[in-house]
């Protein structure tokens, strides 16, 4: 059994009086890809955003329960959320590069952390862009705007920006849904490589993607975690009827 890196227990989240998460219990192991699936509005993205406290940015959101990152309480009052979001990075659905050069995008987090040594920054740019499988595309135009790149290249630069600060966990909210099939395949292949060094938790509506690249899959429905198991079991022999109905396309 791989070491647990994140543990969550009895997680409830309310938007005002509306309960969006209803007692979620989930643990995540190191160096695994976990897919969170379920119909729109089921709570999977809400749960994902709990893992690095992005829901703190929503005034009406209230979270209860426990989240531990390597045994440390994510929601403890003394937790530094800037530090947390370095350790638990986030990649969004739409590529969101800053209106800077490719180089400045990748080193943004490092500079915020006070890194000034140009050799360190240069090395981080090359290493991160290689990990994100976009170095060969951009190595000759690092000082051009990241906004000039294709959507798939922009998303991989955003992934490189997350990797540059050396997170422990990478959260992804439908990272390929806005991309063409070729770009999506490149990112899927890259995630399989990154799994050797990182824990990856991703929301996806793409059942084929979940079955291809994830080690475990969690099915959410109406704010509840219905089933959480190895991906092969979820897709070939689910325990719960709701899981089978969703995967077979009977609803969702």
UniProtKB/Swiss-Prot annotation:
Residue positions binding ATP: 38-45
Keyword Thylakoid: no
Keyword S-adenosyl-L-methionine: no
Subcellular localization: Cell membrane
Pfam families: ABC_tran
Catalysis performed (reactions): phosphate(out) + ATP + H2O = ADP + 2 phosphate(in) + H(+)
PANTHER family associated with the record: ABC TRANSPORTER I FAMILY MEMBER 17 (PTHR43423:SF1)
Similarity comment: Belongs to the ABC transporter superfamily. Phosphate importer (TC 3.A.1.7) family.
Name of the protein in its database record: Phosphate import ATP-binding protein PstB 2
